[in-house]
């Protein structure tokens, strides 16, 4: 049973055999009550949390609180992100007040992940509905993220919906000599007048 617990803990990202062993021993030696609370919370979350039918983020309702907020629908914007964690990051800026669409990943043909695997058929349907005026592409600046953004931009073009890409560049407080060449290239190409 101990081996089963350690193996189950290894499903978490970044948890290898040693970390799983430490966690299991900690719960059994020092925090059995916490372990039971963790098991209950995990069981409840796995049962009751699903995906929003509009944006695909995690929610306990059929439609999440962002998608049901009428103020979020006024500007006709949706921000396409790869994961629910990306929504939290964008929301933390306080600079965006539209709706979202969560891909739950990115296109990766080598891994067998195609458009329907990341919900692009659902996004296509939403674009056809006609209530979206702009799609803000906020996928990660990786090869897969860029390919996904390009695919979605083409989808937007088919539906005559404006598509924009979030800016990439030198981080605030960063030093140019430490920035990689690709990031610096994006910064130079995406410069704007002040």
From Swiss-Prot:
SMART domains linked: TOPRIM
PROSITE patterns cross-referenced by the UniProt entry: RECR, TOPRIM
Alphabetically ordered keywords of this record: DNA damage, DNA recombination, DNA repair, Metal-binding, Zinc, Zinc-finger
Span of domain Toprim: 76-171
One term of GO molecular function: DNA binding
InterPro entries: DNA_Rcmb_RecR, Rcmb_RecR, Rcmb_RecR_Znf, TOPRIM_dom, TOPRIM_RecR
Renumbered zinc finger spans (C4-type): 52-67
Pfam family, one: RecR_C
Gene3D superfamilies recorded: 3.40.1360.10, 6.10.250.240, RecR Domain 1
Keyword Nucleus recorded: no
GO biological processes: DNA recombination; DNA repair
Sequence similarity: Belongs to the RecR family.
Function, in words: May play a role in DNA repair. It seems to be involved in an RecBC-independent recombinational process of DNA repair. It may act with RecF and RecO.
Record-linked PANTHER family: RECOMBINATION PROTEIN RECR (PTHR30446:SF0)
Protein name: Recombination protein RecR
Organism encoding this protein: Vibrio campbellii (strain ATCC BAA-1116)
Gene it is expressed from: recR
